[in-house]
Regions:
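Alpha-helical multipass membrane-protein architecture
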Residues: 1-642
Length: 642
């Protein structure tokens, strides 16, 4: 059931990350060129693109699952990856096992611990994120309202706290936090104007850090440190030129500040440093793959043997399939290849362009999928957006530079690149995310065959339903009906404009590629380093805090306690108690993860319902929204625990 859910929820990832960029380019004034919008969608075009994306994502999702058969052998059998955070799911499965085997009291205690911390997490997030205070046309979380109320002029809590983040002093405008320190000619002396330091109040990142421990968490943060304390300040300090879509020219970054100031560090990060980070993710991943070439050769040899009819270990006589048949991998590759050509040709693109996309998809899903699996296994975070940028770069590089040969207009080239990247996002997400299902199956005895089967069953409904909702929200986002950050979609839209106008700094990608290779050679975790550089300090710092907290807890609290037990009851009892005590902390961490997951899901649903209400600021809706939210969570808790 869990594997089917994984397939259903991640088959539409590409639509969530990439597809909204199409509507932003068509409707958002920020991406208009001097000649008008880069993309113009006629009646029926959106439906046509959605049809192509949904059907193609199904096949791509199947391919992603097939490729993981190879990755499972490499990074779960030959060279196992830790996958921080999988312990939480494993503990939940352990609770279910206790119930089935009669250990009901132990299961109840475990479930109670997780439930208590889930509740504490949701209450905390309710105060931090739920729009409890409605004033005029603004909806504020309680903590944001307190911060703004406790501010006088440019001084007060709002300067150091906003939107769930405790951050460096940023200043305020009318009592509202500016979020980031503004750079201007008058504030050029301020070191905070060149970087962004803070801590996001996210329990899940602390929990993941707890699972990681200090070393792995530090390596992820090392990329963040290099990005935010070295590269970003350099870009701002040396007035590095960045591309401006409206003027269609490279503009020195300090020119954006004008006389009033601007958050140049965020501009430097989004326009330059993230490009280096993407290169680092790919460079570290490629070098890591090169180090594992012998293992890959052995697996490809097994696939070749399976195609020749030679005996293999995936089928057990009298017991059935243990692993999905290896011979199906090339069959799925061929099926996906020709399906992509057919789908995109029916969708109105030339056969040659469809052929090129199909080839890129087959190749990149394997190579970048391997990188995604590795990053997911090392950090618990999947770099879907980073790897998708590489695919978009490849597709636009080919389509925009061979428009006459491929019979493509500039609009067609952009659309094909974005739809193709959407499809890739679904494939890469399936390859990377399913590692959690397979990791848990190793511990509980499920056959990989059944996990693969569940993943495949979930792809079709997930692609249809998830894509439908994502498209609906994309249209509303572009029209301005709803306000969402959509950082990945905006980044893809910006990227598309840059390449359509033949601008951009490809050498930054190459620089990042070399940096990622070096860190992979030096530490063995170049992809984690690149991912850290891709994220902001407030997002990664909680992981480091969590990892350091666990090491300190083990050293100061756990070790003395275990040493005492060892003296009194012997080594065997001490090791047993150590495992039980450590598992109890995993249950707390599981509660933190579960609480944030529940709250995030419910908040997304409520935000969606907000768009359907005639007057989203009506008092009746305020009461109904709040009462519904509370009753929903009380009901869920009652059903689980009573």
């Amino acid at each position: 059931a869990t594997s089917a859910t994984t397939g259903a929820t991640h088959a539409s990832t590409g639509f969530i990350f990439t597809f909204p960029a199409i509507f932003l380019l068509a409707s958002d004034a920020r991406y208009e060129l001097a000649s008008g919008p880069l993309i113009t969608l006629a009646d029926g075009d959106a439906f046509n693109l959605a049809f192509i994306g949904i059907v193609a994502s199904m096949f791509a999702g199947f391919l992603g699952v097939m490729y993981f058969i190879i990755f499972r052998r490499v990074w779960l059998v030959e060279d196992p990856l830790p996958l921080p955070g999988f312990e939480a799911t494993l503990k939940m499965l352990d609770i279910a096992s206790d119930v089935n085997t009669g250990a009901v009291e132990h299961a109840r205690e475990s479930l109670k611990t997780i439930g208590i911390w889930t509740g504490i997490t949701m209450i905390g997030l309710f105060l931090v994120e739920y729009p409890l205070i409605w004033i005029g046309d603004k909806k504020l979380a309680l903590f944001d309202w307190i911060a703004q109320t406790a501010s006088v002029g440019d001084f007060g809590l709002a300067s150091i706290y906003s939107k769930g983040t405790i951050h460096q002093p940023s200043g305020t405008d009318g009592g509202v936090s500016l979020n980031y320190t503004q750079w201007s000619p008058d504030t050029a002396w301020n070191p905070f104007a060149y970087t962004y330091i803070g801590v996001y109040l996210t329990p899940s990142m602390f929990a993941i850090g707890w699972f990681m421990k200090t070393r792995v968490a530090f390596l992820v943060n090392l990329g963040t440190i290099v990005g935010w304390f070295f590269l970003v300040p350099l870009v701002v300090w040396f007035n590095f030129p960045i591309y401006d879509a409206i003027s269609q020219s490279n503009v020195p970054i300090q020119d954006y500040a004008g006389e009033t100031g601007a958050a140049l560090q965020m501009l430097a990060f989004g326009k330059s440093v993230r490009t280096i980070a993407i290169g680092a993710i790919v460079g570290g991943g490629m070098f890591g793959l090169a180090k594992m070439y012998k293992t890959f050769l052995n697996i490809f040899s097994d696939i070749g043997g399976a195609l020749k009819g030679e005996g293999s270990q995936e089928y057990m006589e009298g017991k059935g399939w243990y692993e999905w048949p290896l011979k199906h991998i090339p069959i799925f590759m061929i099926l996906t290849f020709f399906s992509m050509i057919l789908i995109f040709t029916i969708g109105g693109f030339s056969i040659l362009a469809s052929l090129i996309f199909a080839s890129v998809l087959i190749l990149t899903t394997f190579l970048l999928g391997a990188i995604a699996v590795r990053v997911m296994g090392e950090t618990g975070i999947e770099p879907v957006s980073g790897t998708s940028f590489i695919v978009l770069l490849m597709l636009l590089g080919v389509f925009l530079n061979a428009q006459d040969l491929l019979d493509l207009t500039t609009q067609d080239a952009i659309l094909l690149g974005l739809v193709g990247t959407t499809v890739f996002g679904s494939a890469i997400s399936m390859s990377g995310t399913v590692i959690g299902d397979y990791k848990n199956s190793l511990y509980i005895g499920n056959r990989p065959y059944h996990i693969s089967k569940g993943n495949i069953m979930g792809v079709v409904p997930g692609a249809i339903i998830g894509a439908g909702v994502a498209i609906f929200l994309s249209i509303q986002l572009a029209d301005g009906t709803i306000e969402l950050l959509a950082p990945q979609a905006n980044a893809f839209a910006t990227f598309s404009v840059i390449f359509a106008e033949k601008e951009g700094y490809l050498w930054l990608l190459f620089l990042g590629f070399l940096l990622g290779m070096f860190v992979e050679w030096a530490t063995g975790m170049g992809t984690s380093f690149g991912l850290g550089m891709y994220l902001t300090v407030p997002y990664t710092l909680p992981m480091l805090i969590g990892g350091y907290a666990r090491d300190q807890w083990e050293e100061k609290k756990l070790k003395p306690r275990i040493d005492k037990i060892k003296e009194e009851k012997g080594s065997n009892e001490a090791e047993k108690q150590r495992a039980l005590i450590l598992l109890s902390t995993f249950m707390v961490a599981a509660g933190l993860l579960t609480g944030e997951a529940f709250f995030g899901t419910e908040s997304s649903i409520l935000s969606f319902i907000d768009t359907l209400v005639d007057d989203p600021f009506a008092t009746s809706w305020y009461i109904g929204r709040l009462v519904g939210f509370v009753l929903l969570n009380v009901s869920i808790g009652w059903l689980i625990y009573w």
